[in-house]
Amino acid sequence: MFLECNPRFVSRLTRDTLALIMAGGRGGRLSNLTDWRTKPAVPFGGKFRLIDFPLSNCINSGIRRIEVLTQYKAHSLIQHIQRGWGFLRGEFGEFVELVPAQQRMDKPLWYAGTADAVYQNIDIIKAHNPSYVLVLAGDHVYKMDYGGMIARHAESGAAMTVGCVEVPRKRASAFGVMSVNEERQVLAFNEKPKDPTPMPGNPDRALVSMGIYVFDRDYLFQLLREDAENFDSSRDFGKDVIPNAIANHKVQAYPFSDPVSGQQAYWRDVGTVDAFFQANMELIGEDPELNLYDEEWPIWTYQAQLPPAKFIQGRDGRHGTAINSMVSGGDIIHGAEVRDSLLFSQVVVQPGATVHEAVILPDVRVGEGCRIRKAVIDEGCRIPAGTVIGEDPAEDRRRFFVTPKDVVLVTAEMLGQEVAHVR
């Protein structure tokens, strides 16, 4: 594994790589959280958005040529990237470029699928003349050095490499499921199968795609042109392009592991409200698996200019407190109790309110005497005084969205409030 272990060669490979981040999807399984924003723009971890994780991984890996492909409700995503990701130096050939879906002369339609999104932008890829193209999902949470994967790809002689992780077999139907041989060559790939193939010797686990692909540039163009000429194709990497590649060329798997322990590294698909809630709740633990305080692998984002969080004693003498929780800039806890919760920026919790096991997105006002438990409160909500959320299942289902694991999702629309700003 000479290339993978040699920093000089890895840096040459990453400099010769163009990253394409797929950021055009709605993510319908997140329910009302994506009514007004594309999934990669969904806030996460107190101050970030999902798109910040693949973008940060690129920067930290030495990949400084990045295209972000957008389509569905992209304004807040575009705004976020323009404000927070303009620090690369164009004179050095570095960039984060936004590529919105465009109606072209020969194809007056939007992107028909993930593969079609890349196919429609072959001219842009050609203009940058990379040797390798790294295709990334824009909505997963993880920290990964892509240099090792690109080096393994170059060393293996494969035309395509797929990043993969193990997941419980009962959850594998939400992903592309892979079968590999002892040399990690991919033998089969089934997108979201009803009956996922188990791993050999481990019937309760399945090997699934992370939505991360490395291609030799010219081979990618060949695959996409073949797919475009196939009228039966759904224009999707997982459903069409990867199975075609496996049938005709060498496709390699790249298991995502921690470089120190060798164990599978942290990776979360927060594609449902339950998964989103759980991944955020994990962060408030004493030693979470995802370390957001890691100075060696920072997660970059747009930094709004906000004052520090403030804790105020209420008129009745009760102190504003936050226990086993994360709070953010601009938050005010006024004679209220926050416990086991994660608060994004500019959240105000007014006297007598209690917030337990909740994820509160930015710019939320929690009125006096409210009780909120096991809930996700969407951005911009104004919770009226005395409102109770998370205690009466029947009432919660009548007014809000309740997940299979009884997490209550509350949006401004559900409260009868107007969406006041782009999110």
Curated annotation (Swiss-Prot):
It catalyses: alpha-D-glucose 1-phosphate + ATP + H(+) = ADP-alpha-D-glucose + diphosphate. GO terms for molecular function: ATP binding; glucose-1-phosphate adenylyltransferase activity. One of its GO terms (biological process) is glycogen biosynthetic process. It comes from the Bacteria. Keywords: ATP-binding, Carbohydrate metabolism, Glycogen biosynthesis, Glycogen metabolism, Nucleotide-binding, Nucleotidyltransferase, Transferase. Alpha-D-glucose 1-phosphate binds at Y111, G176, E191, K192, S209. Its EC number is 2.7.7.27. Pfam families: Hexapep_GlmU (PF24894), NTP_transferase (PF00483). Pathway: Glycan biosynthesis; glycogen biosynthesis. Homotetramer. HAMAP family: GlgC. Involved in the biosynthesis of ADP-glucose, a building block required for the elongation reactions to produce glycogen. Catalyzes the reaction between ATP and alpha-D-glucose 1-phosphate (G1P) to produce pyrophosphate and ADP-Glc. Belongs to the bacterial/plant glucose-1-phosphate adenylyltransferase family. This is Glucose-1-phosphate adenylyltransferase 1. It comes from Alkalilimnicola ehrlichii (strain ATCC BAA-1101 / DSM 17681 / MLHE-1). The gene is glgC1.
